[in-house]
Amino acid sequence: MTEKKPMIQALQAVRGMNDILPDEAEAWEHFEDIVRDWLRSYGYRPIRMPIVEPTPLFKRAIGEVTDIVEKEMYSFEDALNGEQLTLRPEGTASCVRAAIQHKMLSAGAQRLYYHGPMFRHERPQKGRYRQFHQIGVEALGFDGPDIDAEHILMCARLWDDFGLEDVRLELNSLGSSDERARHRAELVAYLERHRERLDDDGRRRLHTNPLRILDTKNPELQDLVDNAPKLLDFLGEDSLKHFNGVQVLLKDAGVPYRINHRLVRGLDYYNRTVFEWVTTRLGAQGTVCAGGRYDGLVEQLGGRPAPAAGFAMGIERLLALWRESGGEAEPAQPDVYVVHLGEQAQRLAFRAAEALRSHGFAVLMHCGGGSFKSQMKKADASGAPVAVVIGDDEAATGEVGLKPLRGPGGQQRVALDGLANAVAECLFTENEEEDGSL
């Protein structure tokens, strides 16, 4: 009796890190194509950074006493040299590090963008993943309110391009480090007077990162933080002028916004303008896009002092919002499906397929054998409007059969050197019929 082999256990993806299967991946590519065109229309250029960075980069940039650094980073020791490494939790620090390392600012101010996976060790839930994807935009070397306004207007245009509704802009200014220090002292004194009302998280942050208490989601603390000292009241002349300059440009462009005194962002490197685009259409996790200025970060990471601003948006959330608003990507379909039967027919089929691809057609070549009937079923299912059919008779004469699959008309014989023109004519005729031109 043959001994039964034990079942090999199938492995699964890590929880919170999702496979993006072909139907979904096509929607992502359609979305990313639109985004790339949008970014280029504003003069932004692509940059690609490593997924793994030295851990001190994020500790220095994001801040030691932040949720990201304290709780959420995937960090490990390099077994070869003992270096502490981290899967990037965000892109700004990496982009600034690259700009410093390669002396990019010596050539002048830079408008840059990137997109790709980021990693945070969070509890997976709707709209939150351990591996998620971001589009990041960074403008290095620009110090005026105009670049802040440009970033916000860029987002407004993208929402319009995608037909997104119910996305609202919230705005605040964090001022300079000196202004934040004065506000911090008043804020800590205020919170100390109400220490008994703070939750465990608030008491922990009281003397390490009190600004983050203003961003609490605890409903029992809402009236406490609503009455806390407002950073806007501590801004000096320069910070107020900068913030007013942003608002003037937004009003000129007709972009509505709400000043949110509790908007502080979760990363330590921000100063002056900060903003978020939020929606109620994605449940509790309603931030679609966020950004602001980080004028001290270049120097903080070892570069010469340089102003900077940027923003990032989550691709998963944007796609969900786009679909919620009725957005849909058309599935990719070939122009031509090639059917063949017999060895000589197969050889001619490969030549025909490559000839069509040389003329820019998308061609799906049947592989795996089967009868003409079964192959034609697959041709119909592929969505291709035209089939190239090759059997022994066609192979013997060096010709191919051309059969419309969607419109009227029967199969015709075409010489190989005239195939591209014949396919183009078939596709043109079909498009005219779909448009109602005939």
UniProtKB/Swiss-Prot annotation:
The keyword Protein biosynthesis applies. GO terms for cellular component: cytoplasm. It is found in: Cytoplasm. SUPFAM superfamilies: Class II aaRS ABD-related, Class II aaRS and biotin synthetases. Its EC number is 6.1.1.21. Keywords: Aminoacyl-tRNA synthetase, ATP-binding, Cytoplasm, Ligase, Nucleotide-binding, Protein biosynthesis. One of its GO terms (molecular function) is ATP binding. InterPro entries: aa-tRNA-synth_II, aa-tRNA-synth_II/BPL/LPL, Anticodon-bd, Anticodon-bd_dom_sf, His-tRNA-ligase, HisRS-like_core, HisRS/HisZ, HisRS_anticodon. Pfam families: HGTP_anticodon, tRNA-synt_His. It catalyses: tRNA(His) + L-histidine + ATP = L-histidyl-tRNA(His) + AMP + diphosphate + H(+). PROSITE patterns: AA_TRNA_LIGASE_II (PS50862). Its main location: cytoplasm. GO terms for biological process: histidyl-tRNA aminoacylation. Belongs to the class-II aminoacyl-tRNA synthetase family. Homodimer. This is Histidine--tRNA ligase. It comes from Aromatoleum aromaticum (strain DSM 19018 / LMG 30748 / EbN1). The lineage of its organism: Bacteria, Pseudomonadati, Pseudomonadota, Betaproteobacteria, Rhodocyclales. The gene is hisS.
